[in-house]
A protein has these predicted regions:
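N-terminal secretory signal peptides that target proteins for export/translocation
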Residues: 1-9
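Sec-dependent signal peptide recognition
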Residues: 10-17
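C-terminal motif of bacterial Sec signal peptides marking the signal peptidase cleavage site
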Residues: 22-25
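Predominantly soluble domains enriched in secretory-pathway, periplasmic, or organellar proteins
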Residues: 27-391
Length: 391
């Protein structure tokens, strides 16, 4: 019986991979950009997941956003698959891939400077539609709708920027935008908990000359009315916001790149306020069970230098567990950590390296104890992960 079940799962997986590869053989009038296969040498069965997609941002202005896929069972990393599956799409994925998510049978990629959300079949990565949203940033899903943050206006540093940001509401059945809710200036990541949307407002275009030009609040939107109810004061220049297993919120501030450092903040959702400040830089993080895995990449306009850090925080006690994630010295090889994910089953840790932001970046896989398992070349500025569920 176990062999029969295993054979069925293998058959389904082969079907999924076949869909990813089938379309390259039926083009005759269009030049096809072929994907590249890389073997990691670590095939394994991960219960509940086929693998993951990795969205490479690409340097702004070059239309170099690309999409990669890693299959856990075959240990095959397929590099740059979107162009191969969609050869008739001009400029391929577009300019600056900023976020990625899966809802139902669809894969959504937020392409920031191309002002669109690319919607694909999750199994084939063939385009289904594109949704035009100006200067779009991050995406989350709830009850048949996608919610996308938007800076609304052009990409420009301006202390007098007047275009307020919004959250777009998109029907995932029709793939049409149906509503907008105004929030703060330059809203970044959003989170959804108990029928409320929490939005980290940054004001990132407005604070270059003065720290006070940045936003410092989280907008709270009621999903039923789709109206902003209130703001939660946090800190200047917010970016990330993620909920832990108890529904409380973890928010990051970029700081002002001068004297005000990046920090991680804890919002007690019941109280509706910040109750804890974690004294670590928080550029990006991933929450798995009760642990928050975070890295910081802080640049200072005073020293003109970067400071890189890694930490793990216990979301229950709100204490720093360790100020390291990588334990074998490989962190010294990583020039600019740019993305992070934790495998929810075997607890492998994935960290990307943007390098010099021009040449191809790298993807590292570490064991739960922080030792390197494998590494490979990814696309330009590898950044955003999404796991592909098998059921």
């Amino acid at each position: 019986m176990m062999q029969e079940i295993g054979n069925k799962k293998l058959g389904i997986r082969i079907w999924f991979i076949a869909l990813l590869t089938a379309f390259s053989s039926c083009r005759d009038d269009v030049e096809v950009v072929l994907s590249e296969d890389i073997l990691t040498g670590f095939p394994e069965y991960i219960d509940g997941y086929w693998g993951f997609y990795l969205l490479n941002e690409g340097n702004m202005g070059n239309n170099k956003a690309t999409l990669d896929y890693y299959d856990f069972a075959t240990a095959v990393y397929k590099k740059n698959i979107y162009a191969e599956r969609n050869p008739k799409i001009p400029k391929e994925m577009g300019d600056v891939g900023n976020d990625i998510g899966i809802y139902g049978s669809k894969l959504y990629a937020v392409i920031n400077v191309s002002n669109k959300v690319e919607v694909m079949n999750v199994a084939t990565t063939r385009r289904i539609a594109q949704i035009e949203i100006p200067n779009c940033r991050f995406i989350k899903f709830h009850d048949g709708y996608a919610y996308v943050t938007s800076y609304a206006g052009p990409v420009v540093i301006d202390p007098d920027y007047t275009q307020i940001g919004f959250v777009a509401k998109v029907d995932t059945a029709t793939l049409k935008e149906v509503d907008r809710c105004l929030v703060g200036f330059q809203p970044d990541e959003l989170e959804i908990v108990d029928n409320k949307i929490y939005v980290a407002n940054s004001g990132g275009y407005m604070g270059a000359n003065s720290t006070g030009g940045y936003e410092r609040t989280v907008s709270v939107i009621d999903i039923a009315s789709f109206k902003e109810e209130r703001r939660i004061d946090v800190a200047y220049n917010l970016e990330r916001i993620k909920a832990d297993g108890r529904g409380n919120l973890w928010v990051s501030s970029r700081g002002d790149y001068k004297g005000l450092p990046s920090r991680l903040f804890f919002i007690d959702r019941a109280k509706g306020e910040v109750t804890d400040t974690i004294p670590i830089a928080a550029t990006n993080y991933w929450i798995d069970d009760d642990l928050l895995y975070v890295y910081g990449t802080e640049f200072s306009y005073i020293t003109h230098d970067w400071e890189i850090s890694y930490s793990i925080v216990d979301t229950h006690t709100r204490e720093i567990v360790t100020r390291s994630i990588i334990t074998d010295g490989t962190d010294k090889q990583i020039e600019k950590p740019y993305g992070i994910m934790v495998n929810p089953v075997n607890k492998d840790i994935y960290i990307t390296d943007a390098g010099n932001y021009v040449t191809p970046g790298a993807l590292y896989c570490f064991t739960s104890s922080g030792r390197k398992k494998w590494e490979l070349e990814a696309g330009q500025i590898p950044a955003h992960f999404v796991l592909v569920p098998s059921r």
